[in-house]
Amino acid sequence: MGFSNGLKHQYKPVSILELSHKQGDIEKVASIASGGNHLVVLTTHGSIYTWGAGEQAQLGRRVLERRKIHGTVPEKVTLGTRARKATTVGAGAFHSFAVDDKGDVWGWGLNSMGQTGTGYQSSEDSVVQLPKKVKGLSKEELNGDRVVQIDGGTHHTLFLTANGSVYACGRSNAGQLGLSEDHEAFKDQVDPDFVAEPALVSFPDPEDPIIQVSCGSHNCAAVTEGGALYSWGQGVQGELGLGDVEEVRTPRVVVRKDGGAWFAAAVSCGGQHTVGLFRKK
């Protein structure tokens, strides 16, 4: 939980992260990303703190097996060098991410299905122990665009850029990447069931940029600037909002931009359910 390495239950909220500095230097928590059993916290100073379970390296720092309890209290994570400051953090079930002030994207944790986006050549790449740059998503590689949001599912990840583009990597067995079966990302892959480097996801209306994404365990959803809502992936429990469909491989419209009575404002995917925030037009 981040405040004790011996307590098993806490029934009332308590303060977790103490950020003390010299007088006048105020550091606060800016955002929090949660995985299956770990947390990633970004502060207003651009620092990253992680805590929780670290067996899959999702904490981004070394935790000795005989001292696993040390992972349950907050400690800083370094992105290459201490000079780099983070601007965004994200997490999947057992993997984590950060974007630094230069626009580089970093991933770490479980990578057995390529979900960190750092590449996969052999079983040695199944776990990324320390933050490693994600392939193809630096500010230079995106021609000045930059990643502003990252969300992950059990074994997959979505990256959203400032210009409204979405990239995906990881497991694709249930269509959770939003990539068609003939997408070039599947060519020459070590395993046809996953994509180890971020690939661009196409949407029905390319003129309506994406402003928010969310990942469930095996499904995804996205909201556009114009108020449309898309979903894709596994739908065996109705989590796609598309009726009785078990799988959708590419983004499909749930709420239209034009016509209809509702405007999609936000979406959040859970394990096997999805919640949307809508406004009357």
Q: Can you say where each PLM-predicted feature lies in the sequence?
A:
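Fungal eukaryote-biased detector of long internal structured cores
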Residues: M1-M113, S123, G164
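A detector of repeated loop/turn-to-beta-strand junctions in beta-rich toroidal repeat architectures
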Residues: L7-P13, R66-V73, S123-L130, H183-V195, ...
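Short glycine-/Asp-/Thr-/Trp-enriched loop segments that recur within the blades
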Residues: K22-E27, T81-K85, E140-D145, P204-D208, ...
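Structural signature of WD-repeat beta-propeller blades
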Residues: A30, N37, E75, T87, ...
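Conserved core positions of repeat-based scaffolds
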Residues: H38-V41, T50, H95-A98, G107, ...
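Loop/turn-rich, solvent-exposed surfaces of beta-rich toroidal or solenoidal domains
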Residues: L160-N163, R171-A174, A196, S202-G238
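Blade-level signature of beta-propeller repeat domains, shared across WD40, Kelch, NHL, RCC1
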Residues: V245-K281
